[in-house]
């Protein structure tokens, strides 16, 4: 099972497993490298890369946040004629996914996702803080509106 897989459409998530026969191949798979599995994750001839290519996964990305295995932090491939070809980052060190319309970069140990317009997407903790800030802002606007109405 991949560490992370992405489809371009909704799939049944309550099954507990990925079913290629039902869902088809994911558009993009991410594997986070570890000392115990990196050779299998990076093996395009017998390992996961081989299996993912045979399944028709169009984009395959491996990420090493610690950079102990991959000094560059990310190694990725795109499927062409049934074989994975190296997928290089663009000049800004972002890997742009043709399949799902995002770009990924690695800054330090953190992967950063950008939307198709280049805007950085918020991380989980940032989302909670932004929601709290918006709630506070909304409460203040409601208070000002009530005050203006004379309530």
Predicted regions and their residues:
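C-terminal interaction segment
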Residues: 1-55, 63-151
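Short acidic/polar active-site loop segments enriched in Thr and Asp
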Residues: 58
């Amino acid at each position: 099972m991949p560490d992370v897989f992405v489809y371009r459409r909704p799939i049944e998530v309550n099954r507990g497993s990925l079913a290629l026969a039902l869902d088809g191949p994911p558009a993009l798979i991410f594997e986070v490298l570890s000392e115990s599995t990196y050779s299998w994750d990076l093996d395009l001839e017998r390992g996961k890369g081989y299996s993912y290519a045979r399944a028709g996964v169009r984009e395959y990305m491996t990420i090493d946040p610690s950079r102990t295995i991959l000094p560059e932090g990310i190694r990725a491939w795109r499927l062409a004629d049934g074989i994975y070809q190296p997928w290089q980052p663009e000049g800004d060190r972002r890997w742009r996914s043709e399949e799902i319309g995002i770009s990924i970069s690695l800054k330090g140990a953190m992967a950063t996702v950008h939307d198709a317009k280049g805007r950085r997407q918020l991380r989980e903790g940032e989302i909670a803080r932004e929601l709290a800030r918006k709630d506070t802002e909304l409460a203040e606007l409601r208070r000002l509106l009530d005050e203006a109405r004379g309530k």
